[in-house]
Each structure stands twice: as C-alpha cells, then as structure tokens.
Curated annotation (Swiss-Prot):
This is Phosphoglucosamine mutase. Mg(2+) binds at S104, D243, D245, D247. It is an enzyme of class 5 (isomerase). Binds 1 Mg(2+) ion per subunit. It comes from Neisseria subflava. Its cofactor is Mg(2+). The gene is glmM.
Amino acid sequence: MAKKYFGTDGVRGEVGQFPITPDFVLKLGYAAGQVLVQHDGGQKPTVLIGKDTRISGYMLEAALVAGFTAAGVNVIQTGPLPTPGVAYLTRALRLSAGVMISASHNVYSDNGIKFFAEGGVKLSDEIELEIEAKIDEEMKTQPSARLGRARRINGADDRYIEFCKSTFPSHLDLRGLKLVVDTAHGAGYDVAPKVFHELGAQVVSIGDEPNGYNINEKCGATHPKALQAAVLQNEADYGIALDGDGDRLMMVDRNGKVYDGDSLIYVIAKARAREGINIGGVVGTVMTNMAMEIALKEQGVDFCRAKVGDRYVLEQLNQRGWLIGGEASGHILCMDKHNTGDGIISALQVLAALQMLNQDLATICADWQPYPQTMINVRIQKGQKWQEASKDVLAEVEKELEGKGRVVLRASGTEPVVRVMVEARQADWAKKGAERIAAAITGKQ
C-alpha cells in the first residue's frame, strides 16, 4: 500500500503548507501516540523529541507534545540536538520512540518530522502505515488520569558527547590537530566542537551562531566554500562540515580540497581493511563512482549498490551484515559505531583512519580518481514509454563501454524527468553516450 504522508525520510515540507502545519502535526503526534499505546499493551509509553535550530521548531514541538500527551504518551524534550543524538538517546534511555523535528539540509523555511522506533532505528513501513491510518480519525483525548506528561531532560547533549567520544579508539587522541568545524548554524552547533575539543584538538568553530533563520545558509556540508576559506585562513589541518541536523559530513584538507562522502567512506574502509577488521563490505548507491568500487576491491573489500537514499543503504547493510556504507552526499554509516548516519562519529572514524594509516587525506584518496560522469535530465510526458524508446541505444552504449563504465537511468520521484548518467574512463565517452541515450528518449536520434 502506498503511503499518503510519509516520504523516504519522514514527513517534510514548507512550514505553513500542508502537511507542515500545527494542526496536522498535532494529529500526527496523536496518531503516533495511539499506535505506541497499542503496541505497548495499553501501558503509558515515553517518547523523546529533539529538534534543530529552525524558528518553526518551537511551534511544531508544541503541537507534537500536545498530540502525544493527549494520546496518553509521556514526552521527554531535549532541545536542539543532532538527529543521530536523538536516535542514540532513544536507545540508551530505552524509550518507546524518538522524534526529530528537522528538514536536514533544506532551507530554514522548510521543516519535517522524522520518527525512530524503539532501539533508535527508523520506523518500518508497516508502522508508518498504521500511523497514517489513524491520522484522519477523530481525536478523542484520553481521560485526565491517562494523559501523558512532558518534561525537559537535563544533560542530553553531554550524554551524546560522551557517546561520540566513545567511538574513537581509546589509544588515540586528536592532540596536535587544528580543526575548523562548521555546524551549519544547525543542531550540532554546541555539541560538535566540544567532541573534537575534548579529544584534544584545537578547534575553530564557524556556522555556530543559529538565530532560527540561518540554518544551512551558505555554510555546512551543502555549502563547503565557507569551510574551505576558514581552513586556509586559519592554517588548519582539516575542516569538518555537518548539515543542519548533523547526519551528513564533508571534509576539507589543509589545501582547501573538499572530500565528499565517497572519498571518506573509502578512507574508513581502507584503514579497517589494513587493520584486519572484518567489515564484510561497503554499500554504496547506484550513483557511487565506479572508480571507488574498483579501488575498494583492490583493497580486498567487497562492494554492492543500493538505491539512492541512506534508508536503502541501511537496508542493504542490515541484510548483508556489513558495517560501512553511504553516499557521496555525506551520509555515512558505520554500523559498529552507531545504527544511523552520524556526521560527528563519521568524522572521528576518518580522523582515526588517518592516524592508523599514517597518511593524509590527499595521499589516501590518490588511490583512485573518479571516472568522469555526464548527467542529463530529460523531460518526459506522462505515460511516455521512455524505457522502450531507449533500450536499444542503452544496450549499444553499455557494450561500447566494455565494463569500463556504467549507465544509470533513473526516473525522478518529484518531477517529470528521467536522469541519464553515463560514467566512463574518458570524459568524451561519457558525454557522447549520455547524449545518445537522451536523444533516444526524446525521439531526436
């Protein structure tokens, strides 16, 4: 059954527009609360609510709290805390669920609601459908004796800081390193610099002055230019950039070069392989560069691809029992450290890997150079049989690449567009192949 409200990462949209309105979020909290009470055998469950730094977080938090307590659910509020921190505390405090109010890397005028189940894992499709089935039902507030309570927890950030530090090898530290940390004026603005400082690094913080309106604005993992400039200006060893909710990571070296999620995953995997740690393999996506796949296999590390989205990477990791995965966008999963993507913890694993290998980022990543890629967005009409139109040319291009490149055709889930991506060892091969396939789709061969 198709979901009506939940997307791949919870419920998200523009604030004030359905479904990110106070009345809908009130109903969402009430519906989720009803499902929790049913699954807890009629007991009074407890949920944790965290948020990022958007001005709308106050409004949406109040609506969620009202909905949950009306359904007979107790609520613990943390205030601003990264999404992976909410997942961790949901598990550590043995709560029935966790909720994060955030739109991740989006602009401040967007917001969203993301749920975690018991244990800090993402909700199953089945539970999301149960919640959706109750959203449109009439709200019937519990009798006063059954209403939930709401309270703020002290020290949530300190608990999360200690957890992050515990994932860094105990025989290593960060003394002697100068780091610039860009927290995108987001949920990690307070905790992230403290983690690196308490492990011994000299920390220069930027993007750490949230005002409710500046989250992700020309800063953070999606806008690394500010970090590049700060690293060069401060003559730092490395720069670390998170996104608004703290689950993405980009890094910059002392020369100002940016390293995306694929590069950082390779660094972590190579170090683990050299240390003899069995990670099983690495899960990337259909968009992961083929050169990285080849480089990993040269290190003796298996590789497979999932659909685009950290949710699908996580599914593959769990199915295969592998430990490392992620995307170029900076979502990195280290399953032996945390059960969700965590920008701070991922950065710590990269910094540990650099010490284990006794090399810098540039040296390690010189193992592979990304194959050139050409991406063309082709607009299509509703009902257009683009697969049939392109299949012959697609087969020709794949044959010509002779296993030294890849073709990915992907229909957009949000607009009438087919994304044509061709990757090859030579840029002109990629360009010509993508143009031929795009022409076949449009019928302009």
